[in-house]
Amino acid sequence: MSKSKNNVINPLDLVEEFDPEVIKYYLLAKISINNDGVFSNELLKNTYNSELANTIGNLISRTIAMIKKNFDQPVKFVQTDDKNDLLAIASIVKNTKEFQLHFDEFAIDQAFDRMINLAKSLNKYIDLTTPWLLTNNLDRLEIILNILLNGIYAIATMLEIIMPQKVQIIKEVLNLNELNFDLIFDFRKFDEIVVNEMMPLFLRK
């Protein structure tokens, strides 16, 4: 990117198309502070659609929609020995710890790679457990949706570092005033919370 090649990006034009928090996400999550990075409108758009809209946004939208459709009371944590449940719980714990480790070492891009990895694993968990087919088995559905809620909490806690305004919307949906890394590992935190309806968080571009 240089003036001589006439490929300089005007930041004022950029913020007309993208939320400033989205731009900040790309700069911190996709570019290493230790190496040169590549930036273009196309890469920014692809990252936004792939990671924020498709991976994180769809995860939250699907989970909240299934909760609001099937429950009017808190979705509580229940002990489980199901393999897919245990793998999802392990993914929440593992990716959170690795996020914290990378962040403490200033490997910000690697930290947020763990966040996206967690979101992808939870989307896979949805595909494997097919909760939309469990409307006649609410006990099983509750287990799955609580695990997903806990995963969303972890993702929101990580994402708040870069996108506090967007995460404020998530907190309102989750009916929470604040997020805390220590609470990620407490899977009973939603036992007395009724979540709220939500609108799409990240609209595709």
For the regions a language model picked out, list residue spans one by one.
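Catalytic adenosine-cofactor/nucleotide-binding cores of aminoacyl-tRNA synthetases and other
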Residues: 1-86, 177-196, 200
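Residue-level signal for cytosolic alpha-helical hairpin/rod architecture
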Residues: 8, 41, 93-97, 152
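Charged/polar, solvent-exposed surface patches and flexible loops
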Residues: 13-16, 25, 46, 65, ...
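Basic, alpha-helical terminal appendages of large translation-related enzymes
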Residues: 37, 101, 106, 116-205
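Conserved, charged catalytic cores of large soluble enzymes
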Residues: 60-99, 119-137
